[in-house]
């Protein structure tokens, strides 16, 4: 079975409002927020980026996704898995530090961040 792929072109990735307008349309067409059940926790799995890089989804876009899920009465939170290779994403404490350095604060995304233990 082929998976559906949703795409919207972005002319200026730095134009947060334009990107979020396309993202909101994609969320509506995909139906992803509709599967969120009121009162249930929903993990939004993402990659917080490596130290000293900018190759990750911007917090403002995650805010929109989490807001759409929360509008259904669900309780979204952000999460990522630690890595097996050396670096600041090898353990949960430093991994959270990288997430915060990249702007994934509760003020920015509106939800908590949970990175599972190292064990």
Specify the residue positions occupied by each region the protein language model found.
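N-terminal and secondary-structure boundary signal
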Residues: 1-119
């Amino acid at each position: 079975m082929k998976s559906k792929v949703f795409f919207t072109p972005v002319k200026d990735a730095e134009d947060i409002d334009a990107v979020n307008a396309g993202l909101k349309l994609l969320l509506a067409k995909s139906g992803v927020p509709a599967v969120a059940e009121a009162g249930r926790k929903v993990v939004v799995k993402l990659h917080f980026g490596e130290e000293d890089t900018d190759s990750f989804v911007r917090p403002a876009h995650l805010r929109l996704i989490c807001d759409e899920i929360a509008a259904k009465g669900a309780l979204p939170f952000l999460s990522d898995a630690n890595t097996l290779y050396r670096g600041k994403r090898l353990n949960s404490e430093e991994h959270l530090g990288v997430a915060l350095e990249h702007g994934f604060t509760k003020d920015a995304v509106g939800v908590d961040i949970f990175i599972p233990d190292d064990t």
